[in-house]
């Protein structure tokens, strides 16, 4: 029988690594609580139509990367490749953005894309999503950027990330620009890279995102999207930059930043780093003011961003910003297997009274000698011995494992006071 192994592109989080996730997740919650965002939990399976209508049928994600299947009823379902579409569906279905309501939400969970696995890019990956609905003004644009900035500062990596900004204008602006771009690229058709040629028919704006040097040289003299954007939207983008200057948030303008999802409008942004090679983007987002209406809801202003958790962890590890793991327990109990009904009751009472303590024991209840060896390896500060003699006399034995102190005896009814010191 062949050995069963993990699916390519998927990863186990081993016990030795889970503390890194717990550390990052605790920082995420700290920051989002500070800005009064509410957590929501979304299903990992949605109807395929949701992503066709939101992410876009011509996008690389929907056309090449989604995990699609039919259930036993013949319904076409998809493992979510991103979180925004599902969050919008949830908001519409539960009437959370009707009659002028506003919502500030966040979620964190696994997403799925069939991509070539490499460092920082996996077929199952965890994503933090932050979404806000019903806010029209610049203030919410600044707030969502400030949330990411605050998280990076809290993690000690703000000097290693760069905010890149662009404006995509309105849908009409993009249509007009797309026609101008196609007209410009016509004479260069044969010189474009293979992916860019495919995008000419499906999603021409994505050509701006090409990393191929030859294509970038062709684009150097192409029409600029900013020249096709309405005056009001251009002014709004300029004001956003001015406010970021006032907040002390460093940024640079990137006129080729277009994002790979069809639903973005107006402001788009990415946080990038030069520490992770080709997988440089760790956070990306923007406004998507038309998406709620496109999916059947009322016209609703919306903005959000997503952070790739694995990439952020890789960056933290590379920069030495993760805390050292501390698996050591505080107290190790050494028990007589013949008297477990009494001694286990004492241990459980202490766990209830002192929940902050990490308490362990040898559940095989070997000899006292073997239990002491395990106590030494556990990293515990003290070992508490409860054998037959201790039970008969009403005192627990206390052995200090990290200090050169003599063994003590403490009455059972004083153990909690002793451990609190």
Curated annotation (Swiss-Prot):
- What are the protein's GO molecular function terms? ATP binding; histidine-tRNA ligase activity
What InterPro entries does the annotation carry? Answer: aa-tRNA-synth_II, aa-tRNA-synth_II/BPL/LPL, Anticodon-bd, Anticodon-bd_dom_sf, His-tRNA-ligase, HisRS-like_core, HisRS/HisZ
**Does the keyword Manganese belong to this entry?**
no
Q: What is its main location?
A: cytoplasm
Name any GO cellular component annotation.
cytoplasm
Q: Which UniProt keywords apply?
A: Aminoacyl-tRNA synthetase, ATP-binding, Cytoplasm, Ligase, Nucleotide-binding, Protein biosynthesis
According to UniProt, the name of this protein is Histidine--tRNA ligase
What species is this protein from?
Answer: Francisella tularensis subsp. holarctica (strain FTNF002-00 / FTA)
As recorded in Swiss-Prot or TrEMBL, the protein's gene is named hisS
């Amino acid at each position: 029988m062949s050995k069963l192994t993990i699916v390519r592109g998927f990863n186990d989080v081993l016990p030795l690594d889970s503390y890194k996730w717990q550390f990052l997740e605790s920082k995420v919650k700290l920051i989002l609580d500070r800005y009064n965002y509410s957590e929501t939990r979304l299903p990992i399976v949605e109807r395929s139509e949701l992503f066709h209508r939101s992410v876009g049928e011509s996008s690389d994600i929907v056309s090449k990367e989604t995990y699609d299947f039919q259930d036993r009823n013949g319904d076409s379902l998809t493992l979510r490749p991103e979180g925004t579409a599902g969050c919008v569906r949830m908001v519409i279905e539960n009437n959370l953005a009707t009659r002028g309501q506003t919502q500030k939400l966040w979620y964190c969970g696994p997403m799925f894309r069939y991509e070539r696995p490499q460092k920082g890019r996996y077929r199952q990956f965890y994503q933090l999503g932050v979404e806000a609905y019903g806010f029209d003004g610049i203030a919410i644009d600044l707030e969502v950027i400030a949330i990411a900035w605050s998280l990076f500062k809290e993690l000690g990596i703000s000097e290693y990330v760069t905010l890149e900004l662009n404006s995509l204008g309105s849908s009409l602006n993009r249509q007009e620009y797309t026609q101008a771009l196609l007209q410009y690229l016509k004479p260069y058709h044969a010189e474009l890279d293979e992916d860019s040629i495919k995008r000419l028919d499906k999603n021409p704006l994505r050509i701006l995102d090409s990393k191929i040097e030859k294509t970038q040289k062709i684009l150097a003299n192409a029409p600029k999207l900013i020249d096709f954007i309405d005056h009001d939207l251009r002014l709004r983008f300029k004001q956003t930059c001015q406010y970021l200057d006032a907040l002390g948030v460093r940024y640079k303008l990137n006129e080729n930043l277009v994002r790979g999802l069809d639903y973005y409008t107006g402001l788009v942004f990415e946080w990038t780093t030069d520490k992770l090679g080709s997988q440089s983007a760790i956070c990306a987002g923007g406004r998507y003011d038309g998406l709620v209406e496109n999916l059947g809801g009322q016209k609703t202003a919306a903005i959000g961003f997503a952070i790739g958790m694995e990439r952020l962890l890789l960056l933290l590890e590379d920069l030495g910003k993760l805390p050292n793991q501390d698996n050591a327990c505080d107290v190790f109990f050494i028990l007589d297997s013949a008297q477990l009904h009494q001694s286990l009751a004492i241990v459980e009472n202490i766990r209830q009274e002192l929940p902050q303590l990490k308490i362990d024991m040898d559940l095989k209840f070997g000899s006292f000698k073997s239990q002491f060896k395990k106590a030494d390896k556990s990293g515990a500060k003290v070992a508490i011995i409860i054998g037959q003699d201790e039970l008969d006399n009403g005192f627990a034995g206390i052995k200090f494992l990290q200090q050169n102190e003599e063994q003590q005896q403490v009455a059972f009814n004083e153990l909690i006071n002793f451990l609190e010191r």
